[in-house]
Curated annotation (Swiss-Prot):
Signal sequence residues: none
Species: Bacillus subtilis (strain 168)
Record has Transport as a keyword: yes
Membrane-side (Extracellular) residue stretches: 36-42, 102-105, 158-160, 231-234, 290-292, 356-358
PANTHER family in UniProt: BLL5896 PROTEIN (PTHR23522), NUCLEOSIDE PERMEASE NUPG-RELATED (PTHR23522:SF4)
Family: Belongs to the major facilitator superfamily.
GO MF entry, a single one: cytidine transmembrane transporter activity
Protein name, entry field: Uncharacterized transporter YwbF
SUPFAM superfamilies referenced in this protein's UniProt entry, alphabetically: MFS general substrate transporter
Keyword entries, A-Z: Cell membrane, Membrane, Symport, Transmembrane, Transmembrane helix, Transport
Principal subcellular localization: membrane
GO cellular component: plasma membrane
Positions in the Cytoplasmic compartment: 1-8, 72-75, 124-134, 181-210, 260-269, 316-327, 380-399
Transmembrane segments: 9-35, 43-71, 76-101, 106-123, 135-157, 161-180, 211-230, 235-259, 270-289, 293-315, 328-355, 359-379
Length: 399
């Protein structure tokens, strides 16, 4: 493959992740504040709107994956859905009705749910074909999200009204859509029968077990984004400190994503997944004990270890254990379990625990889930050593 073309494709992929996450990072973290401050919605109304995203993703992410596998037009689908996501975001400015906000939130989540799994599918396939580093591309997403959260907080606090987050978000997502049209395409393969492909995945015991690992290990890290500010506030952190710690946590993912492939090459996929799960478990156990603020400051980088290593390793593992012709479906099912159902469950259950017990008890729930994920990862590691004890379909692509 021509070196110049490869460099252009890598630049397009990095640019897409950067601007796509700049877009979503501009809107999602401050959406609840916009609905509360400018639209004067109640807490329960805001909670309902914010909970729609994960629920919608549960259903739509597998749909987009199956559509991608069937049409084999992944990058076109990605470009269209990314631009539509940004345009839908503008509707929050145009309307001021709670029922319409519910509709807008559902539509926004439906199209936004394509961004991560389809771009990951393209990036994983291309880095494998060119012996590249997926983590070196994906880190631009963490960079974009971290910069967006920090910058939008400053912009809306000092310069402009909060509704500008939708204008910036739309602009960034439209730029990402243009870049999506420049990413590498995929080679044509035999079109998959959607029902047959889905049955193939749900009959894959290894895949199903790993979906549970994703639910128990990765989902608490996502739900932590909802409760971390409450945890910090209860621990005595100021508002400015909370913003800085959020930023440091997101940015800390970058170096670990950058060197994740080095860890994977030396340790193996499941060992890296177990390492990230162990770090998550340690973090939740620490937070459950209501530590001093200086300990929280000193350990915030653990988010980078837990998420920065898990994402590249988990995606490559899903790709490894599933046939190529249902790859996009598998990745979107993985996203639906982690970003969708798992995130929703941990956030929903955590809300009840926070209301009736304490914010620190929320991290006990996260810790219990992480213990289960750690144990299942050990099970898969043993099963890999004794492959005859665990049935899995033949993989139809070269690793």
């Amino acid at each position: 493959m021509h070196n110049l073309q490869v460099r252009r494709h890598y630049a397009a992929l990095k640019g897409f992740y950067l601007f796509a996450f700049l877009g979503t990072g501009s809107i999602i973290p401050l959406l609840s504040m916009y609905l509360t401050k400018e639209q004067h919605l109640s807490g329960s109304q805001v909670g309902l709107i914010m909970s729609l995203g994960p629920i919608v993703m549960i259903f739509f992410q597998p749909f987009w994956g199956m559509l991608s596998d069937y049409t084999q037009k992944t990058k076109g689908l990605l470009a269209v859905c990314t631009s539509i996501t940004g345009i839908i975001g503008l509707a929050y400015i145009a309307f001021d009705s709670f029922p319409l906000f519910i509709l807008i939130a559902a539509c926004f989540a439906a199209f936004q749910s394509t961004i991560i799994p389809l771009s990951d599918s393209i990036s994983l396939r291309y880095t494998q074909e060119t012996n590249g580093n997926y983590g070196g591309i994906r880190l631009f997403g963490s960079l974009g999200f971290g910069v967006a959260v920090f910058a939008m907080g400053q912009v809306t606090n000092q310069l402009y009204p909060i509704h500008v987050i939708f204008i910036f978000g739309c602009a960034f997502l439209c730029i990402a859509a243009i870049l999506a049209s420049q990413v590498p395409g995929q080679q044509k393969t035999t079109k998959v029968n959607i029902r047959k492909g889905f049955r193939e995945l749900i009959s894959n015991k290894t895949f199903l077990i790993f979906m549970i690992i994703t639910f128990t290990t990765f989902a608490p890290n996502l739900a932590n984004n909802t409760y971390f500010s409450l945890f910090l506030d209860k621990s005595g952190a100021s508002l400015s400190a909370i913003g800085i710690l959020f930023f440091i946590g997101v940015i800390s993912e970058i170096p670990f994503m950058r060197f994740a492939q080095t860890f994977i090459d030396k340790m193996g996929l499941l060992n890296v997944i177990m390492l990230s799960g162990g770090v998550s478990l340690f973090r939740w156990a620490l937070y459950f004990t209501a530590p001093s603020l200086w300990i929280i400051y000193a350990t915030v980088f653990l988010q980078g270890v837990a998420i920065g290593l898990f994402i590249p390793a988990a995606l490559q593992y899903v790709k490894k254990i599933t046939p190529r012709h249902v790859e996009a479906t598998a990745l979107t099912m993985y996203a639906a379990i982690g970003n969708g159902f798992g995130n929703w469950f941990c956030t929903f259950a955590g809300g009840y625990i926070f209301d009736y017990v304490s914010i620190f008890a929320v991290y006990l729930l996260f810790g219990i889930l992480s213990i289960a994920g750690f144990g299942l990862t050990l099970y898969l590691m043993k099963a890999e050593k004794n492959k005859h004890t665990l049935h899995q379909p033949a993989v139809t692509f070269k690793p």
